[in-house]
Amino acid sequence: MRAVLTVIGKDNVGIVAGVSNKLAELNINIVDVSQTIMDGYFTMMMMCDISQITKEFDEVKTELTGKGEELQVKIHIQREEIFNAMHKL
């Protein structure tokens, strides 16, 4: 099972490390990642394998939201099938 994770906010030191460490803590594997800085704003999209999580998905979302607040960025995660349904042309 996979999920799409996005991170957006003002660029700052430690965002990638903070997000990656939190994902590892939650047993989430990063499958693919794209990241860029646009005019001082940090943007990152990750494809994640969530098949090994031991918590409910809603709890994972809550913990990632909290990590985003700590890092002063917005972190959003959703299951891949939901993401695809929302972005289908």
From Swiss-Prot:
NCBIfam families: PRK00194.1. PROSITE patterns: ACT. Belongs to the UPF0237 family. Residues 4-78 form the ACT domain. It comes from Listeria innocua serovar 6a (strain ATCC BAA-680 / CLIP 11262). SUPFAM superfamilies: ACT-like. It comes from the Bacteria. It holds the Pfam family ACT_6. InterPro entries: ACT-like_dom_sf (IPR045865), ACT_dom (IPR002912), UPF0237/GcvR_regulator (IPR050990), UPF0237_ACT (IPR022986). This is UPF0237 protein lin0537.
